[in-house]
Regions:
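C-terminal subregions of glycosyltransferases and related glycan-biosynthesis enzymes
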Residues: 59-62, 66, 71-169
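Conserved nucleotide-sugar donor-binding catalytic segment
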Residues: 2, 6-94
Length: 169
């Protein structure tokens, strides 16, 4: 998985199990730019796999839990360009309902531990969602829809999540 320095380690790290890999990758496992797969592994994926509407790449990625070796490459190679006034869909729902539902399913199947799932959700709650709010309401560089945000948090996050997200901005 390629993270372009977003994790801050600026190195490559290998993992011998999916749980440790996901724990260290955290919510970046949702990033479509980072996912890559060998064609031979892609061809083994069940053709009837139901792809998540917002995270089809993550649906594919999570099928690779049985692999023997995983790699996170956090070396910086590219300058990421900010797209002004980026938006158009409900990114808040994507990270309060859709992506957490994939993690929940992965946990229920035993591919990641409850500790791993909670770690990833905590990262979203104190890092990712506050940055979305900051970009939308404070510096106004993104225009993502946030309809249902406060209510959607109640499904996969603790009862205090809304307030923690707000104070983390």
């Amino acid at each position: 998985f390629y993270t372009n320095g977003l994790l801050g380690s600026r190195k490559s790290q290998t993992y011998s199990n999916f749980n440790d890999f996901m724990y260290n990758l955290s919510y970046w496992s949702s990033w479509s730019n980072g996912f890559n797969i060998w064609k031979s592994e892609f061809d083994k994926i069940d053709k009837n796999l139901k792809l998540n509407k917002l995270f089809p790449h993550t649906s594919l990625f999570l099928t690779q839990h049985q692999a023997k070796l995983f790699c996170i490459n956090d070396n910086l190679l590219f300058d990421v360009q900010r797209i002004p006034k980026r938006g158009g869909h409900n990114k808040f729902e994507a990270f309060t309902i859709e992506y957490p539902s994939l993690l929940d399913e992965c946990c229920k199947k035993g591919h990641i531990s409850t500790k791993c799932k909670k770690h990833i959700l905590f990262g979203i709650m104190v890092q990712f969602l506050p940055s979305l709010l900051f970009n939308k309401y404070i510096i106004r560089i993104e225009t993502f829809d946030d309809t249902g945000f406060r209510n959607n948090l109640k499904k996969y996050y603790p009862s205090y999540a809304y307030w923690l997200v707000l104070i983390s901005v």
